[in-house]
């Protein structure tokens, strides 16, 4: 009937991807990314790294995979040597428990390269952009 159709078509739709964090609260991927890129602080960087890890490690949404570009963004961020130093010096104990390694200078670049490769695996169309990035950054 028309009523049934209207009720089912007006229901909540599921998101294709999980973007991490609290949706109606303050901490969302969008807010953290904006704050970090607008005025990066050690705290904003540490929070964003942990948000990326949550999104990549716990893919949700109807597709059950990280959103397009997230692995590439996160991987690139981990390949910046200063970010490993900042994380080691400023991350909270809880944030540091996100990763098994305490040697961030070695762990971050390895994981960064893996994430760039994962972006290509999940989204083959990204290879044209990501492959030269890997070649340039992961010598």
Question: Locations of the language-model features?
Answer:
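Boundary/linker segments of alpha-helical solenoid repeat arrays
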Residues: 63, 123-134
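Short acidic/histidine-centered micro-motifs embedded in hydrophobic/aromatic stretches
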Residues: 73, 133-136
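N-terminal alpha-helical interaction modules that lie
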Residues: 11-71, 78-107, 122, 138
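C-terminal motif of bacterial Sec signal peptides marking the signal peptidase cleavage site
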Residues: 6-9
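Secondary-structure-rich domain cores
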Residues: 112-113, 124
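Extracytoplasmic/secreted envelope proteins and their assembly/folding machinery
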Residues: 72-75, 113-116
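Sec-dependent signal peptide recognition
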Residues: 1-3
């Amino acid at each position: 009937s028309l009523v049934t159709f209207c009720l089912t078509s007006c229901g909540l739709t599921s998101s294709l991807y999980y973007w991490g964090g609290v949706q109606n609260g303050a901490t969302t991927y969008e807010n953290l990314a904006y704050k970090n890129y607008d005025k990066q602080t050690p705290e904003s960087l540490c929070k964003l790294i942990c948000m990326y890890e949550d999104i990549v490690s716990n893919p949700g949404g109807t597709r059950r995979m990280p959103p397009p570009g997230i692995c590439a963004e996160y991987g690139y961020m981990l390949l910046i040597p200063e970010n490993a130093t900042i994380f080691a010096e400023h991350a909270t104990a809880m944030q540091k428990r996100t990763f098994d390694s305490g040697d961030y200078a070695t762990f971050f670049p390895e994981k960064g390269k893996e994430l760039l490769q994962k972006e290509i695996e999940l989204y083959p169309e990204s290879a044209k952009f990501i492959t030269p990035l890997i070649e340039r950054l992961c010598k």
